[in-house]
């Protein structure tokens, strides 16, 4: 198994699919990485040379991925909560942030139903 950006990449999958195992790298980004590195996207990771894997590592390093990306996202949410803006309050209360209805639905964000006290 190759290790790129601190993630074990599966050997038996195509390069594009394998790169999506990295948090912050989707299909489009993976295709761009392969194109910039000059690697065939349909080639399997086990068939790539060490030199090609090194170029992939270099290309992935240009993007914000894994822990840095998670930290960035959490810091942005924390900033909204500290500002006290509407979006921050919704994050703090655990409700939908982007204007969805909450009278019905929104169960994923609100969590399981709580019994009504009498």
UniProtKB/Swiss-Prot annotation:
Belongs to the universal ribosomal protein uS13 family. Coiled coil: none annotated. This is Small ribosomal subunit protein uS13. One of its GO terms (biological process) is translation. It comes from Pseudomonas putida (strain ATCC 47054 / DSM 6125 / CFBP 8728 / NCIMB 11950 / KT2440). One of its GO terms (molecular function) is structural constituent of ribosome. Part of the 30S ribosomal subunit. Forms a loose heterodimer with protein S19. Forms two bridges to the 50S subunit in the 70S ribosome. InterPro entries: Rbsml_uS13_C (IPR027437), Ribosomal_uS13 (IPR001892), Ribosomal_uS13-like_H2TH (IPR010979), Ribosomal_uS13_bac-type (IPR019980), Ribosomal_uS13_CS (IPR018269). It holds the Pfam family Ribosomal_S13. GO terms for cellular component: cytosol; small ribosomal subunit. NCBIfam families: uS13_bact. Residues 92-118 are annotated as: Disordered. Keywords: Ribonucleoprotein, Ribosomal protein, RNA-binding, rRNA-binding, tRNA-binding. It comes from the Bacteria. SUPFAM superfamilies: S13-like H2TH domain. Located at the top of the head of the 30S subunit, it contacts several helices of the 16S rRNA. In the 70S ribosome it contacts the 23S rRNA (bridge B1a) and protein L5 of the 50S subunit (bridge B1b), connecting the 2 subunits; these bridges are implicated in subunit movement. Contacts the tRNAs in the A and P-sites.
């Amino acid at each position: 198994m190759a290790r790129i950006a601190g993630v074990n990449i599966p050997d038996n999958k195509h390069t594009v699919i394998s790169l999506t195992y990295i948090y912050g790298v989707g299909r489009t980004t993976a295709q761009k990485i392969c194109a910039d590195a000059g690697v065939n996207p349909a080639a399997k990771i086990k068939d790539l040379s060490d030199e090609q894997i090194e170029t992939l590592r270099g290309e992935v390093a240009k993007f914000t991925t894994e822990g840095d990306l998670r930290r960035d996202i959490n810091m942005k949410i924390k900033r909204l909560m500290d500002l006290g803006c509407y979006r921050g309050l919704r994050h703090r209360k655990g409700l939908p942030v982007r204007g969805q209805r909450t009278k019905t639905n929104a169960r994923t964000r609100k969590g399981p139903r709580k019994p009504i006290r009498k």
